[in-house]
From Swiss-Prot:
Function: This enzyme is involved in nucleotide metabolism: it produces dUMP, the immediate precursor of thymidine nucleotides and it decreases the intracellular concentration of dUTP so that uracil cannot be incorporated into DNA.
InterPro entries from the UniProt entry: dUTPase (IPR008181), dUTPase-like (IPR029054), dUTPase-like_sf (IPR036157), dUTPase_trimeric (IPR033704)
Domain of life: Bacteria
Gene that produces this protein: dut
Enzymatic reactions: dUTP + H2O = dUMP + diphosphate + H(+)
Keywords, comma-separated and alphabetical: Hydrolase, Magnesium, Metal-binding, Nucleotide metabolism
Protein name from the UniProt record: Deoxyuridine 5'-triphosphate nucleotidohydrolase
Entry's EC annotation: 3.6.1.23
Pathway of action: Pyrimidine metabolism; dUMP biosynthesis; dUMP from dCTP (dUTP route): step 2/2
Phylogenetic lineage: Bacteria, Pseudomonadati, Pseudomonadota, Betaproteobacteria, Burkholderiales
Length: 150
């Protein structure tokens, strides 16, 4: 699928490092920390980091999600403070990344370091219909852990 999304470059340093798919099979584009100096995130601390880019998806059938980079989370404990960022199709502001240090050691984010990834996803705005009872299903109301392990 080839979908065009408008973007604004808010930090000239990104001109040579625009978000791009690294491989033909890549789902996400890397977002960078557009900061001037290293930014230390202490254990347990959350900070909001600008990416230097704004997007306008425009198509109400699409949205974007911001996800953590697996290496930062696994090696350094740096994940998203809001776990997943949701960017609606009508949002036009700068993309910001909430970084949370869930680790036990401070981590210094470097200027233009890749800190998160952006994935474009389809959206369905479902119509809801109130009912008194649901049609029976195999699972019913069985909740957390009800399907077992393995």
């Amino acid at each position: 699928m080839n979908t065009q999304i408008e973007y604004k470059l808010l930090d000239a340093r990104l001109a040579e490092q625009l978000p791009a798919y690294a491989t033909p099979g890549a789902a996400g584009l890397d977002l960078r920390a557009c900061i001037d100096l290293p930014l230390e995130i202490a254990p347990g601390q959350t900070t909001l980091i600008p990416t230097g880019i704004a997007i306008h998806i425009a198509d109400p059938g699409l949205a974007a999600i911001i996800l953590p980079r697996s290496g930062l989370g696994h090696k350094h404990g740096i994940v998203l403070g809001n776990l997943v960022g949701l960017i609606d199709s009508d949002y036009q502001g700068q993309l910001m990344v909430s970084c949370w240090n869930r680790g036990s050691v401070a981590y210094a984010v470097q200027p233009l370091e890749r800190i998160a990834q952006l994935v474009i996803v389809p959206v369905v705005q479902a119509q809801f219909r109130q009912v008194d009872e649901f049609e029976a299903s195999d699972r019913g109301v069985a909740g957390f852990g009800s399907t077992g392990r393995g």
